[in-house]
């Protein structure tokens, strides 16, 4: 079952990479504007989440996202997806997810037990958009 989950997550990343050319890029500086809302304004979460940054999301795309992640200086640094494990295990596919930038320099995937906004256990899939993005979002 876990292998299936990881395979599904890998396919999610591949799909995101392939669909990049089809999607418009997000603004390089925060805030991105409508239809995006700042996650900390809508949910009881901090404005800047270490490891993820300041997040913006179009509510119509929940739970998966994309979440646009900006660093402390408001620079676009990552695209984040939050895919509920139960939905993946039940065969849900997240196809044609938008990406915030054509450039992806690294990818992190990790488990999250749940938090306000995405209460169920899920995978965070983080696409970093420049070589220093992960370090800028870390603190």
Question: Where are the predicted features?
Answer:
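Contiguous hydrophobic segments
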Residues: 1, 11-12, 134-139
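Gram-negative bacterial Sec-dependent N-terminal signal peptides
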Residues: 2-21
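Metal-centered catalytic cores of metalloenzymes
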Residues: 21-139
């Amino acid at each position: 079952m876990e292998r299936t989950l990881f395979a599904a997550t890998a396919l999610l990343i591949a799909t995101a990479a392939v669909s990049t050319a089809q999607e418009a890029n997000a603004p390089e500086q925060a805030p991105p504007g409508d239809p995006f809302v700042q996650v900390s304004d809508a949910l009881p979460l901090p404005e800047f989440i270490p490891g993820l940054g300041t997040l913006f999301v179009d509510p119509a795309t929940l739970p998966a996202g994309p979440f646009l992640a900006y660093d402390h200086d408001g620079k676009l640094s990552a695209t984040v997806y939050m895919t509920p494990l139960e939905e993946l295990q039940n065969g849900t596919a997240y196809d044609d997810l938008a990406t915030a930038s054509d450039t992806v320099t690294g990818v992190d995937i990790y488990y999250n037990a749940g938090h306000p906004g995405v209460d169920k256990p899920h995978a965070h899939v983080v696409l970093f958009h420049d070589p220093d993005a992960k370090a800028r979002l870390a603190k």
